[in-house]
Design a protein with these regions (language model features):
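Helix-loop boundary and gating motifs at the non-cytosolic
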Residues: 1-54
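Residue-level signature of mid-helix packing/kink "hotspots" within the transmembrane helices
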Residues: 51-59, 144-145
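Cytoplasmic helix-loop-helix junction between adjacent transmembrane helices
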Residues: 101-142
Length: 159
Protein backbone atom coordinates (compact mmCIF):
# COMPACT_ATOMS: atom_id res chain seq x y z
CA UNK A 1 0.00 0.00 0.00
CA UNK A 2 2.69 2.47 -0.95
CA UNK A 3 0.11 4.84 -2.38
CA UNK A 4 -1.38 5.38 1.08
CA UNK A 5 0.84 8.12 2.49
CA UNK A 6 0.90 9.36 6.06
CA UNK A 7 -1.31 12.32 5.10
CA UNK A 8 -3.88 9.99 3.53
CA UNK A 9 -3.86 7.80 6.66
CA UNK A 10 -4.28 10.78 8.98
CA UNK A 11 -7.10 12.31 6.95
CA UNK A 12 -8.81 8.93 6.64
CA UNK A 13 -8.58 8.14 10.36
CA UNK A 14 -9.84 11.59 11.33
CA UNK A 15 -12.70 11.11 8.89
CA UNK A 16 -13.45 7.68 10.38
CA UNK A 17 -13.64 9.02 13.94
CA UNK A 18 -15.60 12.13 12.95
CA UNK A 19 -18.11 10.05 11.02
CA UNK A 20 -18.41 7.55 13.88
CA UNK A 21 -19.17 10.41 16.29
CA UNK A 22 -21.71 11.93 13.92
CA UNK A 23 -23.42 8.64 13.17
CA UNK A 24 -23.73 7.86 16.89
CA UNK A 25 -25.87 10.97 17.25
CA UNK A 26 -28.01 10.92 14.11
CA UNK A 27 -30.17 7.86 14.90
CA UNK A 28 -31.18 9.23 18.31
CA UNK A 29 -31.23 12.92 17.43
CA UNK A 30 -34.92 13.15 16.40
CA UNK A 31 -36.00 11.37 19.60
CA UNK A 32 -33.86 13.68 21.73
CA UNK A 33 -35.04 16.80 19.92
CA UNK A 34 -38.69 15.75 20.27
CA UNK A 35 -38.15 15.15 24.01
CA UNK A 36 -36.89 18.72 24.53
CA UNK A 37 -39.76 20.30 22.66
CA UNK A 38 -38.89 20.31 18.96
CA UNK A 39 -41.81 19.74 16.64
CA UNK A 40 -41.44 17.43 13.65
CA UNK A 41 -41.56 20.49 11.39
CA UNK A 42 -38.78 22.21 13.35
CA UNK A 43 -36.62 19.07 13.16
CA UNK A 44 -37.11 19.06 9.38
CA UNK A 45 -36.25 22.75 9.12
CA UNK A 46 -33.16 22.23 11.29
CA UNK A 47 -31.86 19.40 9.12
CA UNK A 48 -32.66 21.23 5.90
CA UNK A 49 -30.88 24.40 6.96
CA UNK A 50 -27.93 22.41 8.34
CA UNK A 51 -27.42 20.45 5.13
CA UNK A 52 -27.88 23.59 3.02
CA UNK A 53 -25.20 25.27 5.13
CA UNK A 54 -22.78 22.43 4.36
CA UNK A 55 -23.68 22.40 0.68
CA UNK A 56 -23.38 26.12 0.08
CA UNK A 57 -20.21 26.55 2.13
CA UNK A 58 -18.26 23.73 0.42
CA UNK A 59 -17.76 25.63 -2.82
CA UNK A 60 -16.94 28.90 -1.14
CA UNK A 61 -14.36 27.48 1.25
CA UNK A 62 -12.91 25.16 -1.39
CA UNK A 63 -12.22 28.17 -3.61
CA UNK A 64 -10.93 30.14 -0.62
CA UNK A 65 -8.45 27.38 0.25
CA UNK A 66 -7.31 27.28 -3.38
CA UNK A 67 -6.80 31.05 -3.43
CA UNK A 68 -5.00 31.02 -0.08
CA UNK A 69 -2.77 28.16 -1.21
CA UNK A 70 -3.16 26.63 2.23
CA UNK A 71 -5.35 23.64 2.83
CA UNK A 72 -4.41 22.35 6.27
CA UNK A 73 -5.87 25.27 8.27
CA UNK A 74 -9.23 24.78 6.52
CA UNK A 75 -9.18 21.07 7.31
CA UNK A 76 -8.21 21.70 10.94
CA UNK A 77 -10.83 24.40 11.49
CA UNK A 78 -13.53 22.35 9.77
CA UNK A 79 -12.89 19.24 11.85
CA UNK A 80 -12.58 21.37 15.01
CA UNK A 81 -16.01 22.91 14.38
CA UNK A 82 -17.51 19.45 13.96
CA UNK A 83 -15.79 18.15 17.10
CA UNK A 84 -16.90 21.12 19.20
CA UNK A 85 -20.50 20.91 18.02
CA UNK A 86 -21.10 17.29 19.10
CA UNK A 87 -21.04 17.86 22.88
CA UNK A 88 -22.91 21.14 22.38
CA UNK A 89 -25.83 19.20 20.94
CA UNK A 90 -25.91 16.97 24.01
CA UNK A 91 -25.73 19.69 26.67
CA UNK A 92 -27.95 22.37 25.15
CA UNK A 93 -31.67 22.14 25.87
CA UNK A 94 -33.04 25.20 24.08
CA UNK A 95 -34.03 24.78 20.43
CA UNK A 96 -32.12 27.86 19.24
CA UNK A 97 -28.89 26.60 20.82
CA UNK A 98 -29.34 23.12 19.34
CA UNK A 99 -29.98 24.80 16.00
CA UNK A 100 -26.73 26.76 16.43
CA UNK A 101 -24.74 23.62 17.33
CA UNK A 102 -26.07 21.68 14.34
CA UNK A 103 -25.29 24.55 11.97
CA UNK A 104 -21.73 24.72 13.34
CA UNK A 105 -21.32 20.98 12.69
CA UNK A 106 -22.39 21.27 9.06
CA UNK A 107 -20.49 24.54 8.58
CA UNK A 108 -17.38 22.66 9.69
CA UNK A 109 -18.09 20.07 7.02
CA UNK A 110 -18.34 22.81 4.43
CA UNK A 111 -15.07 24.39 5.54
CA UNK A 112 -13.05 21.17 5.46
CA UNK A 113 -14.40 19.17 2.52
CA UNK A 114 -12.86 20.99 -0.45
CA UNK A 115 -9.48 21.45 1.22
CA UNK A 116 -9.41 17.83 2.45
CA UNK A 117 -10.22 16.48 -1.00
CA UNK A 118 -7.54 18.72 -2.53
CA UNK A 119 -5.01 17.40 0.00
CA UNK A 120 -5.96 13.83 -0.89
CA UNK A 121 -5.62 14.65 -4.57
CA UNK A 122 -2.21 16.24 -3.98
CA UNK A 123 -1.05 13.04 -2.27
CA UNK A 124 -2.01 10.85 -5.22
CA UNK A 125 -0.60 10.31 -8.66
CA UNK A 126 -2.86 9.96 -11.66
CA UNK A 127 -2.53 6.17 -11.29
CA UNK A 128 -3.40 6.11 -7.58
CA UNK A 129 -6.16 8.74 -7.30
CA UNK A 130 -8.92 6.12 -7.32
CA UNK A 131 -7.15 4.03 -4.69
CA UNK A 132 -6.47 7.03 -2.44
CA UNK A 133 -10.04 8.34 -2.64
CA UNK A 134 -11.43 4.80 -2.36
CA UNK A 135 -9.37 4.17 0.78
CA UNK A 136 -10.50 7.45 2.32
CA UNK A 137 -14.12 6.76 1.44
CA UNK A 138 -13.92 3.24 2.87
CA UNK A 139 -12.57 4.58 6.17
CA UNK A 140 -15.36 7.18 6.22
CA UNK A 141 -17.92 4.43 5.58
CA UNK A 142 -16.38 2.28 8.31
CA UNK A 143 -16.94 5.19 10.69
CA UNK A 144 -20.57 5.30 9.54
CA UNK A 145 -20.85 1.62 10.48
CA UNK A 146 -19.04 1.90 13.82
CA UNK A 147 -21.00 4.93 15.05
CA UNK A 148 -24.53 3.49 15.08
CA UNK A 149 -23.17 0.15 16.31
CA UNK A 150 -21.59 1.85 19.33
CA UNK A 151 -24.80 3.81 19.95
CA UNK A 152 -26.82 0.59 19.80
CA UNK A 153 -24.50 -1.17 22.25
CA UNK A 154 -24.57 1.81 24.60
CA UNK A 155 -28.36 2.09 24.49
CA UNK A 156 -28.71 -1.66 25.04
CA UNK A 157 -26.79 -1.47 28.32
CA UNK A 158 -27.89 2.04 29.36
CA UNK A 159 -31.43 2.55 28.03
Amino acid sequence: MKYITRTVWVLSLVSLFTDAASEMLYPIMPIYLKSIGFSIVLIGILEGVAEATAGFSKGYFGKLSDNAGKRIPFVQIGYAFSAISKPMMAIFIYPIWIFFARIIDRFGKGIRTGARDALLSDEATSETKGKVFGFHRSMDTLGALIGPSLALIYLYFYP
